[in-house]
Amino acid sequence: MAYTQTATTSALLDTVRGNNSLVNDLAKRRLYDTAVEEFNARDRRPKVNFSKVISEEQTLIATRAYPEFQITFYNTQNAVHSLAGGLRSLELEYLMMQIPYGSLTYDIGGNFASHLFKGRAYVHCCMPNLDVRDIMRHEGQKDSIELYLSRLERGGKTVPNFQKEAFDRYAEIPEDAVCHNTFQTCEHQPMQQSGRVYAIALHSIYDIPADEFGAALLRKNVHTCYAAFHFSENLLLEDSYVNLDEINACFSRDGDKLTFSFASESTLNYCHSYSNILKYVCKTYFPASNREVYMKEFLVTRVNTWFCKFSRIDTFLLYKGVAHKSVDSEQFYTAMEDAWHYKKTLAMCNSERILLEDSSSVNYWFPKMRDMVIVPLFDISLETSKRTRKEVLVSKDFVFTVLNHIRTYQAKALTYANVLSFVESIRSRVIINGVTARSEWDVDKSLLQSLSMTFYLHTKLAVLKDDLLISKFSLGSKTVCQHVWDEISLAFGNAFPSVKERLLNRKLIRVAGDALEIRVPDLYVTFHDRLVTEYKASVDMPALDIRKKMEETEVMYNALSELSVLRESDKFDVDVFSQMCKSLEVDPMTAAKVIVADMSNESGLTLTFERPTEANVALALQDQEKASEGALVVTSREVEEPSMKGSMARGELQLAGLAGDHPESSYSKNEEIESLEQFHMATADSLIRKQMSSIVYTGPIKVQQMKNFIDSLVASLSAAVSNLVKILKDTAAIDLETRQKFGVLDVASRKWLIKPTAKSHAWGVVETHARKYHVALLEYDEQGVVTCDDWRRVAVSSESVVYSDMAKLRTLRRLLRNGEPHVSSAKVVLVDGVPGCGKTKEILSRVNFDEDLILVPGKQAAEMIRRRANSSGIIVATKDNVKTVDSFMMNFGKSTRCQFKRLFIDEGLMLHTGCVNFLVAMSLCEIAYVYGDTQQIPYINRVSGFPYPAHFAKLEVDEVETRRTTLRCPADVTHYLNRRYEGFVMSTSSVKKSVSQEMVGGAAVINPISKPSHGKILTFTQSDKEALLSRGYSDVHTVHEVQGETYSDVSLVRLTPTPVSIIAGDSPHVLVALSRHTCSLKYYTVVMDPLVSIIRDLEKLSSYLSDMYKVDAGTQXQLQIDSVFKGSNLFVAAPKTGDISDMQFYYDKCLPGNSTMMNNFDAVTMRLTDISLNVKDCILDMSKSVAAPKDQIKPLIPMVRTAAEMPRQTGLLENLVAMIKRNFNAPELSGIIDIENTASLVVDKFFDSYLLKEKRKPNKNVSLFSRESLNRWLEKQEQVTIGQLADFDFVDLPAVDQYRHMIKAQPKQKLDTSIQTEYPALQTIVYHSKKISAIFGPLFSELTRQLLDSVDSSRFLFFTRKTPAQIEDFFGDLDSHVPMDVLELDISKYDKSQNEFHCAVEYEIWRRLGFEDFLGEVWKQGHRKTTLKDYTAGIKTCIWYQRKSGDVTTFIGNTVIIAACLASMLPMEKIIKGAFCGDDSLLYFPKGCEFPDVQHSANLMWNFEAKLFKKQYGYFCGRYVIHHDRGCIVYYDPLKLISKLGAKHIKDWEHLEEFRRSLCDVAVSLNNCAYYTQLDDAVWEVHKTAPPGSFVYKSLVKYLSDKVLFRSLFIDGSSC
């Protein structure tokens, strides 16, 4: 018993926790059924097509306003006021939804064409021609009917059944459908109409007098009238101009004339009577007779349209208790006219009536008055001396925000100008991460000046009241009025007497507080209406007759009871079944009995449907004669030319081959260019081919190959789409490997159910709520994928080729002629070369980039070819003549060049043979060279089930050339190559033994700790690659991915113990794997395989055999004669010539457009306009969003126009934008790194590369923290800094992780044209307090001194406190006769890109130099997670790592990091010279050195966005390093110098002289014009538009050397 109780309790707990699978499955099933029911209910909503083009926001407005409809937005028709026009159809359908179907309905002023299209034969439209525009509108409706009928006729169709009755009615008796009388005079007489009569008035009651409306309705015996009209509550406030923002329309009123018009477009206006509309809005009762009245009730307001209904009321039905005896005053006074005294009694008797009374009240809410206040504005006319005072509604929050802020101003700062400036600035909106951090107050800009004056006067009065209160109302000799004028006179200054006189004369200002009173308005206004009628008779309330409907329901209920015995009968839709039976005139009971008998095999009758659905059951017993009327007639038609769009519309994507019995002639192709947009929202079924193995190809072999290639794209596209559909159908059941390739987005929750590894997929497959699957072109916004309302899920694939396959299919199908591809007559030459034979080098030597084209399979190969071709500095290889195969096909016809003389295809045998044939034909070349390797990996057909016969894999060529000498492979690999190739393979490599293997105990043994990576890591399979990447290895690729690449050392890894088909003795993958290295290859494997046997055989290869494959390649030498003079620069004094215009011309040529930028008020514009920002976690004090006003000193104005900006004022917005663009914009590029071990290896490389061997160990006898080191540090500090340390006892450490943040007021100039398109962010400074700097400053100063003393100064320059002359001395021994590669590493966001790895490298360097462990750990923690506080701007945030720009180690730390970064990537043992300074570097290597992919390594290891440039001359720290045959000269960048001459921050003439002296110090070398020619070349290397600049260099020397002349470059700003 105890066991049973325990088991029961355990099972119950499992169920509660969700561990009971049975309960979970039931819950999921219940959730699924609920979702299906909900979606089915949505599908049953009326469907409305919205054809007009509207924006996404307007789409949302329409959808939310009318949830009763299922709206489909086609966006196919541009029109005026498209939203309002499109809403008309929704409004009409909403009104018609209120009316029982089939009841006689009068549409007052309606659109009879709309009712015809909907098949409403029970609607009569009263459409009077009140003006010419009405006639035009009626003719337009007739045109729409004619257009509809002509379309049907052109398509060979007839009017559908549901429209037939309405169209017949209009054709035979048009006056029954529409008349042209007013509703009050309509003569339409219904024929045998039973039931109630209804009316609708869609935007038409404006023109019907309100007093006649009730009588007109009663005349037509209307039971209920539904109306819709545009209105705004603000019209009740007697506003003369009211906006309807949602439909972009407006009302304007002039007296009783009310005009309605649409804004931002040229359309006709509508004029109505304001008083008449007001009656419809405010009245409740509309009398129709002495007995009946129509009562109005508002229903809803949707998109600026008010809906109401007028219900017919019989006053005789009123409860008798409301009747009372009273005197009819009109009858009384009429009788009194006849007799006053004698007939008084008779008059009283005659005037007695029984009256019925009722009353109503309507509240109108004014939403715009909520949180608003009424503010007075003052104005005066100078011509008429007439003063005016008006009141406006302004946001309460806005008013008191302004008043509270300016109330804090000091007396001198409280001026009208400062108040106006603040009001302008806070009107703009600040959005942080999509959330409004500072609200935007919708205040009319034209009111800001008047409001500012009111706020200013209000504050002045408040200041006075405070003074009076403080003095306890003791005013002395001055009156209250005099106090006010004293305050105003302080603000207006000398202008006060005239101002005071004018204000007094006009009585503009009153001292009393009520003149400046700010009041709160009412939110509601109530309108009353009263009904008085005479009691004459009494009747009973009639009941509604629903007997007929109940009888029909009983029949349907009995029929469904019969059907309930069938399987899946619970899924029958009763509404659909009843409608089908009614429309087909089938008895439901009979249909049900026959179906049950047939399904139970009791009737001996077989019906034609497969499943008993609602429609099939009704169709089963439809009358044969009526069924034949709607039968589908199959007719023969001519064979069409199939297009992409047509194919998908028919549910198929055609093949180029012959499938089944289809004739070949049916597969032709038209010449139109089809867009990829045609694929958007195509059904997935239209792209999936389920059977492709029976395709037959005809024609020559090349044609067959080309057709097969087209079909392979179709098959690939089909497989990709099919896989995504499968993922959508079974998201939860896919395995881990599949999860790594796909992604599934749940649209409702905006979350990834399966997160993809890649981002920004161009295409995907969409699952709708109706469980339909479509291929969709994906778009993105700040929230991710842009989705539609009917989307349920979106699937994407990292391996998906949907986009490229679609683009290539579009191109290739366009090239077909009558369904046949065109074969080029060009000569095709196959260049068959062994691995490493120099195929790419040969291509570069043979190609003429002006007339030839190079195509490669991969993007990296294309970039490599361009890089190698442009290595000389001259750009010859571009994206126009070096392309990938996919790019060439996808963008065919878009390039300026369409014909090439010769075509070079690198690794062409990796492509489909049909693809190669297409490339030759598309290039229109005379001869095509296909470079490849017949023994390496060929084209692989990756679509299972797609036929790719063996004879298709052989490329048809005219000639074959062989290359059998490898420049890469060592001797042992060359021995293996001789087994695989025909002919004798030779090698130029000096390496004899290169391959080895190691059997490992299991896959877990392979990790970065026990098996650190050596060289390039390769795998055979993608799964092994992903496993290695997950364990911490970087830069891992498969063998197939690196075909054609070369590496010094290779580590080949196999983790899969199961058999792998591509690892075989004759496998091309094995050949590629063995031939990638130049020095060594080591194979790590968990099992014995054929590759192990091959490597073991090669390990045993004798030296005698390896020497047989060697080819000696000698080196040619040339006799060199050194210059006679070395070590000193030739000096030629530069002549002082030129003018200001020379500098301006040179600047405009180098940076075109920069000088035209009017950026003086950019900062003001940003502060006064709306701004939307996205930030990381931070705390903002919005009270600091507007800085306190300061006195502005006008700076000197430069005569040279550059992109220099005015100094910025610090504040929340400026500081926050700077922080976003810098501190919050750190890249995340790095891969998985073993930080400690990798940092240790990097530091080893750093010490080995830069430090002298004898000084690589720290001197432990020297104390870092001593009195001498502190004194040396203090000597470099300013007195202010030392004063801050006066109260510091050095006993305890302050918070090392706390930093302050500030910005430099002057933006940094960039020597590019980015200023024309972006707002430059200010440079941020993050710094410690001086107390922390006093502790660590001396330490790092001493560490820096020791580091610089240990550096090999003959080869490396760490630019710290060096002069230009010292730089020239360092580079002076460069030999210009020795070919050199000058390298520069350009890194963007250098400081902010530094992360934990950089910190680890830097700390390890300091540790090895002798940094004490405890302080080192403190310093490390102070740079890990740090807090930034900006007290000026009111910002507080937290950042991880990053270089602190105001730290004691900022400069030397950056210099050390850039040096360590380069040492880890480049062969520093070969370097000639190297210089490092902050994030700048300049390296000189011997010509021809091979360098790794620096950009790739910098991204993955160092998190740097880096580019490595090869140049002729170096550029270092803003200076050009010009090496020549006598030494080296360093020129300051002349363009940078000119940019500084446009500075806008020079305060006065003394400041200008200091500025000139600093420029003279840095530009002294320009006095030597001996090397101006080389300087021109160096500048042109950076700025391609720069002209020869000797004229401007001389002009700079002229102005910099003359103090008086230099002053002419600026003018006094205060005088302007």
UniProtKB/Swiss-Prot annotation:
Complexes and interactors: Heterodimer of a large and a small subunit.
Protein name: Replicase large subunit
Binding-site list for ATP: 833-840
Domain (+)RNA virus helicase C-terminal as annotated: residue spans: 964-1116
Reactions catalysed: RNA(n) + a ribonucleoside 5'-triphosphate = RNA(n+1) + diphosphate; ATP + H2O = ADP + phosphate + H(+)
InterPro entries hit by this protein: (+)RNA_virus_helicase_core_dom, Alphavirus-like_MT_dom, DNA/RNA_pol_sf, P-loop_NTPase, RNA-dep_RNA_pol_alsuvir, RNA-dir_pol_PSvirus, ToMV_Hel_N, Virgaviridae_RdRp
Database matches in CDD domains: Virgaviridae_RdRp
Note: This protein is translated as a fusion protein by episodic readthrough of a termination codon. When readthrough of the amber terminator codon TAG occurs between the codons for Gln-1116 and Gln-1118, this results in the addition of the RdRp region to the replicase.
Chain positions covered by the region annotation Helicase: 830-1085
UniProt similarity note: Belongs to the ssRNA positive-strand viruses RNA-directed RNA polymerase family.
EC id: 2.1.1.-, 2.7.7.-, 2.7.7.48, 3.6.4.13
One MF term in the entry's GO annotations: RNA helicase activity
Alphabetically ordered keywords of this record: ATP-binding, Helicase, Host-virus interaction, Hydrolase, Inhibition of host innate immune response by virus, Nucleotide-binding, Nucleotidyltransferase, RNA suppression of termination, RNA-directed RNA polymerase, Suppressor of RNA silencing, Transferase, Viral immunoevasion, Viral RNA replication
